[in-house]
A protein has these predicted regions:
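Proteolytic maturation boundary segments
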Residues: 1-17, 25, 160-285, 443, ...
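M16 family metallopeptidases and their MPP-like homologs
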Residues: 22-34, 60-168, 188-193, 200-204, ...
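Peptidyl-prolyl cis-trans isomerase
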Residues: 169, 177, 365-366, 422
Length: 537
């Protein structure tokens, strides 16, 4: 299809008062280039450098200096005939988006003055190389990429040129595309603000013409679900009503899993796979919400967020640079039943990546400034959840299934009250009491041998103190004797969220796996499930 780049003759600013929004959001969009255009690679580097990480000009200005938002994202999105370079940020409550826009252009001026170094460029390209191989790590990924190259580049073999283009970007390219597509160029600005807070939108914005569906009670269309839908079928060269015969059962080659338990009690499980030069790992430390005080829910979530914000000997920015320079990613997060440290790295850098994991795990920095930022970000997320139907449903459903007094009935992030009551000492207490190798499992898959894995864990095994962790005895969950219907009203909601369920099997139950297969076929398998087919088809 013929390329049709967008040309703006003026900057356009529009706003919209959202009935359900809790926080103001600003989007800035510049016309850019289509997928696989020679400039798209430098634009992706530019977006990453400007917005991602502690060193990013946008992060430094909007998050750290001006404290207008918890995060800011920027990305280059290329399609078949055109593309867009987009910035998005959700500001804190009652923040004037004019101040946010002003801070954005202040950050861009900083970039104009300082540019991008070879070191930072190498760091970003290392991450992009890892992402490239990640996209090829499954059969689905390979098929999707080859199809995408055929459609957008006209040749599936472009896969080989794509990675070369990623690695060929220079600092001069990044400056050039900034000057060509961003600096002094017209853009589209959209301000989405809570109802009756139009003053938070950018000045000189016009009201967007958004047609809202009117919800009229009792006006729903009536239909008989027993009547099969009729529709005109697409012509076919063969009779699709005749089901083809089943072929032979596939010969599934289950990968070999090796196991080892280290002297500290740390359990290790691994699969060696050399198809792509990557290693992925996950360290699961049992606990999470299970070990929290009901009056201070959110401790494990905040702790996980703080673990990757520097170490004893590395500032947050230094740690981030060390990770990204390896083409790696290391994330920490909490779940209802664990605190998890996961990672993804080039195989050649696996040992160096695990050395950083050891620092993160055993030498936390405990920086008050970072704790305050994470706390503020969490409070902002909790506020946003109030406008998210799925979050509302999940929170209400957990209370009904587990009961008000069960620890798992709580939102993992906590509430405004509980998060505000948490101090950094609460995190230190959880860390010193509940983080132990004796309740930890390490899973690793990739181009790495068992001996290399155990060697990478030797320092963690030697230096991590094992302790007895006491888990609370949870009340037994009871299945309701009769079906019950609960309704949570969101006035003016445009859609409904339905949840059906009851307390069921533990993951250790012998029927758990058969039940997951049953559930997949019944309703959990997307378009392969009977429920979806009944509702959609």
């Amino acid at each position: 299809m013929k390329k049709q780049p967008v040309v703006l003759i003026e900057t356009k600013k529009v706003y919209y008062e959202d009935n359900f929004a809790r926080l103001p959001q600003l989007n800035l969009t510049w016309p850019s280039v289509y997928q696989y255009h020679k400039d798209s690679y430098a634009l992706k580097v530019l977006a990453t450098y400007l917005s991602k990480g502690k060193k990013a000009p946008l992060y430094k200005t909007l998050v750290e200096q001006e404290q207008l938002t918890a995060s800011v994202s920027m990305f280059q999105s290329g399609s078949e005939i055109a593309g867009e370079f987009m910035l998005r940020t959700t500001a804190f409550s009652n923040t004037d988006l004019d101040e946010v826009e002003k801070a954005v252009f202040k950050a861009l001026l900083d970039f104009e003055a300082n540019g991008i170094s070879e070191t930072d460029l190498s760091r970003i390209k290392a991450g992009q190389e890892t992402d490239f191989y990640n996209s090829l790590s499954s059969v689905l990924g390979k098929g999707a990429k080859l199809a995408q190259y055929e459609i957008f580049a006209g040749d599936a073999a472009f896969i080989n040129q794509d990675v070369k283009n990623i690695l060929a970007v220079t600092p001069e390219d990044v400056i050039r595309v900034y000057n060509t597509y961003i600096k002094g160029k017209h853009y589209v600005a959209t301000s989405f603000v809570p109802k009756n807070q139009a003053t938070l939108a950018l000045q000189n914005s016009t009201l967007a013409n958004v047609v809202e569906e009117k919800i009229i009670e009792g006006a729903e269309e009536q239909f008989d679900a027993s009547i099969a839908a009729t529709y005109k079928k697409t012509p076919s060269s063969f009779d699709r009503s005749i089901e083809p015969p089943y072929g032979e059962n596939p010969d599934v080659k289950v990968p070999s899993v090796w196991k080892e338990e280290l002297s500290s009690g740390l359990g290790v499980f691994g699969i060696e796979n050399n198809e792509v030069p990557l290693v992925q790992f996950q360290m699961q430390i049992k606990g999470g919400l299970l070990l929290e005080d009901a009056n201070k829910v959110g401790v494990s979530n905040l702790l996980a967020g703080l673990l990757t914000k520097g170490t004893k000997n590395k500032t947050p920015e230094q740690l981030e640079n060390a990770i990204e320079s390896l083409g790696a990613s290391i994330n920490a997060y909490a779940t209802n039943e664990s605190v998890v440290i996961s990672g993804n790295t080039l195989a050649k850098n696996y040992a160096k990546t695990m050395a950083l994991v050891k620092e993160i795990l055993l030498e936390p920095r405990w920086e008050e400034k970072e704790f305050d930022l994470i706390k503020q970000s969490t409070l902002s997320q909790i506020e946003q959840q109030k406008a998210n139907p799925n979050s509302i449903a999940a929170n209400a459903y957990a209370k009904l299934v587990y009961g008000e007094n069960h620890i798992l009935s709580n939102n993992l992030s906590g509430t405004e009250k509980s998060v505000n009551s948490i101090s950094i000492d609460d995190l230190k207490q959880y860390y010193s009491t509940n983080m132990s190798p004796s309740i930890t499992k390490f899973h690793v898959v990739g181009a790495v041998t068992a001996s290399e894995v155990t060697a990478s864990l030797s320092d963690i095994n030697d230096d991590w103190e094992s302790k007895d962790v006491t888990f609370p005895v949870l009340p037994e969950l009871k299945t309701p004797e009769n079906s019950q219907v609960y309704f949570y009203n969101v006035p003016g909601a445009k859609q409904s969220v339905l949840r059906f369920g009851y307390p069921a099997l533990a993951a250790t139950d012998t029927d758990y796996y058969p039940a997951t297969i049953m559930n997949y076929r019944l309703g959990g398998g997307g378009f392969a499930s009977q429920l979806t087919q009944q509702l959609r088809e």
